[in-house]
A protein has these predicted regions:
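Non-heme Fe(II)-dependent double-stranded beta-helix
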Residues: 1-97
Length: 97
């Protein structure tokens, strides 16, 4: 059993998976902020955002992420929905899990 699968089986979740470099993360944030400006509003909870924007699709299909998912569920992976859950700093909003 690989380490990712073992952690998932033991804990039920995975943390600390290094997928993006800091520069990659900034690039995707810039894409998000530009899209919010171009679309005149927040993308918070906008469903299937990966259909209209390339950046979320690139994130969801990043090889490092897909390798981790595949190690848990196998190679048959379907991206059905991609949604941004946005919590801006120093706001009264919250994200409940």
């Amino acid at each position: 059993m690989n380490a990712i699968l073992e952690k998932f089986v033991t804990d039920g979740y995975i943390t600390g998976l290094q997928v993006l470099t800091p520069d990659d993360a900034l690039l995707h944030r810039d894409h998000l902020e530009r899209a919010e400006k171009d679309l005149s509003g927040s993308l918070h909870y906008l469903n299937k955002v990966h259909i209209i924007l390339k950046s979320p699709f690139d994130l969801a299909t990043h090889p490092k992420l897909l390798d981790a998912v595949e190690s848990i569920i196998g190679p048959d992976i379907l991206l059905y929905n991609c949604t941004f859950i946005i919590k801006e700093p120093k706001t009264a909003t919250f994200v409940s899990w």
